[in-house]
Amino acid sequence: MSGENVTKVSTFILVGLPTAPGLQYLLFLLFLLTYLFVLVENLAIILIVWSSTSLHRPMYYFLSSMSFLEIWYVSDITPKMLEGFLLQQKRISFVGCMTQLYFFSSLVCTECVLLASMAYDRYVAICHPLRYHVLVTPGLCLQLVGFSFVSGFTISMIKVCFISSVTFCGSNVLNHFFCDISPILKLACTDFSTAELVDFILAFIILVFPLLATILSYWHITLAVLRIPSATGCWRAFSTCASHLTVVTVFYTALLFMYVRPQAIDSQSSNKLISAVYTVVTPIINPLIYCLRNKEFKDALKKALGLGQTSH
């Protein structure tokens, strides 16, 4: 296609979630309440962790960093989704679409590395308890969280630069409720194999290597736990990792269903539904998984709410 005959797309139209007529206002209210709950829930975790001296430890520093990530993450997707429920035509500019894609990809990549960092923290706590405070220092925690964000945002910058260089000159109807890589590239009218290859390589690096680090950490944790002679001690040691392991399982399972499904079971409707669950529901579930099983956090929450200390 000759360059002079190409009219580049400057605006995308988001199809949004499939809804029955008349249900969009109910869905708007449902997702709005969910969004507000995520904000309040994660802000509360951050405030409680930073205001309670008993929680000034590496595990809770990682937890507050994860809550900050969840707030940013859900705020990248949900406002545009809510707008889509109220408007007949859900438009987003090309720059706005690339910006949304950049932050979505960056935050997913950051969470991969942050979960691996949290797995390392649990590994040291279980396998080297006497050296824990020497190995996992506040400085190291800051470096691990900083590295998670820097690596996630840098890799995503490269991915989005390649994707934004692709020419979009045909249909501008994006069959999704937010700007994701696969539905965007389906609208390309020039060869996008280079952008697709770069995306695959960088996604492999940022997803697989942190996952391998997490698996390796839990392999050593499992071996250490199995060496504990008493069943009570064994359960107590492993229960400290149960919340993080649950979040890791939910996170990677959702990613696999979203991006690594066989073509035979792939459909835009199911993909959008899984994406909606992943982008809105998991930011609610993750803090609950971490906090509801944690006695120290529940005690700090009761103290913050003026309900007094639990009896010992």
From Swiss-Prot:
Protein name from the UniProt record: Olfactory receptor 6B2
Xref: Gene3D superfamilies: Rhodopsin 7-helix transmembrane proteins
Annotated Pfam families: 7tm_4
Gene name in the database record: OR6B2
Lineage, broadest ranks: Eukaryota, Metazoa, Chordata, Craniata, Vertebrata
Membrane topology term: Multi-pass membrane protein
Cystine bridges: C97-C189
Intracellular or extracellular location(s): Cell membrane
Keywords annotated in UniProt: Cell membrane, Disulfide bond, G-protein coupled receptor, Glycoprotein, Membrane, Olfaction, Receptor, Sensory transduction, Transducer, Transmembrane, Transmembrane helix
Family stated for the protein in its record: Belongs to the G-protein coupled receptor 1 family.
Record GO terms (molecular function): G protein-coupled receptor activity; odorant binding; olfactory receptor activity
Glycosites: N5
Residues on Cytoplasmic side: 47-54, 121-139, 218-237, 293-312
Transmembrane segments: 26-46, 55-75, 100-120, 140-160, 197-217, 238-258, 272-292
Listed GO CC annotations: cytosol; plasma membrane
Membrane topology (Extracellular): 1-25, 76-99, 161-196, 259-271
